[in-house]
Amino acid sequence: MFTTKSGEKIFVVDGHVHLWDGSDKNIKNRYGEEFIKCFYDYHKLSPKEYVWPYKKYQKYTDEDLEQDIFQNGYVDFAIFNPQYLGDFYHHGFSSLERNEAFRKKHPDRVIANWFWDPRNEEAGLKQLEQDVEKYGWKGVKLYTAEWKGDSKGWKLTDPWSYRYLQRSQELGIKNIHVHKGPTIRPLNKDAFDVGDVDEVASLLPDLNFIVEHCGLPRLNDFTFIAAQEPNVYAGLSVAIALIHTRPRYFSEIISELLFWLGPERILFGSDYALWQPKWIIEKFMDLELPEDLAAETGQITLEMKKKILGENTARLYNISVGEPKHFGSAVSEAPEPLRKGAPVA
């Protein structure tokens, strides 16, 4: 929890964290190298004291995450929202097994989402059903610009995507996290276009579409979609990290989101290990909108910040907002054997 200067406790859910492997050993081709190096360039938007050496950034440890998220980062609950990138990395950029093992170490503080790719068609649907039965996923992370063979991306409105979305809903997955934000080299910017969210949100109103990175650089497109679709949410990861190097720009982003969506549909995420939650949360809690922006959209308040930092995501995932959780508390779940083999990809 974050404690304000007045002593008030703020419950924090980091809705977008990663354990990735961008090591030289795991890189399959030049595209994998380009991807992790582009990630590292984004990482350098951090305050200097939070910038890691490149080799550590390529593959950090479970202990790094525990320290940066739970011990130092004010986070009470964290949610893995990974990407696979099987065409770039031998064993995937993110590992289901590694994420699940970490979740089992901290079952009262971690939710591990996974992914699906509609280009896997029927085989992927069967894999989804098996995995939901085994792992009980509450959400998925979709990466519409991911390369697969000759394909350089897909759309939420593709026929197979609709089948996956409908099956997800039938299986009890309600939270659909979609990367609709800045492009990472070598992926294509247009494949992350936010426009396809509009139709699926209208036709599948019982699903929650969390648009990660709030559609940047297409913020206006996103806000006008979200204004008319009550099941569309803004994920602040990436955008909120601009609070350090581009505070005015971030103030413009958050003021637009508050005006069009309201504070109940904005969700905090650090995108760790792109950035660490500690400095982001500290700067966000100190944020006051410039007078000219506040005159149009209103000032951001403590109650709004409480909703954004934890209460909104807790509501979507049925997380109890209560007393602070202490790092290293007893595990309440017996370990299970991990699934062998790679996902369908």
Where are these regions (language model features)?
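Mid-to-C-terminal alpha-helical segments outside catalytic/metal-binding sites
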Residues: 1-15, 22-69, 77, 130, ...
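Histidine-centered catalytic micro-motifs
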Residues: 12-22, 176-180, 211
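Divalent metal-coordination and catalytic microenvironments
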Residues: 16, 69, 78, 112, ...
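Active-site environment of divalent metal-dependent phosphoester hydrolases
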Residues: 18-23, 85-88, 118-120, 146-149, ...
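Short aromatic-enriched loop/helix-cap "lid" or pocket-rim segments at secondary-structure transitions
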Residues: 23-29, 92, 125, 152-154, ...
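Alpha-helical scaffolding within the catalytic cores
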Residues: 60-67, 94-100, 124-128, 194-197, ...
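Active-site gating/metal-coordination segments in enzymes
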Residues: 77-191
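Catalytic pocket-lining loop regions of alpha/beta-barrel enzymes
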Residues: 138-139, 153-268, 296-299, 304, ...
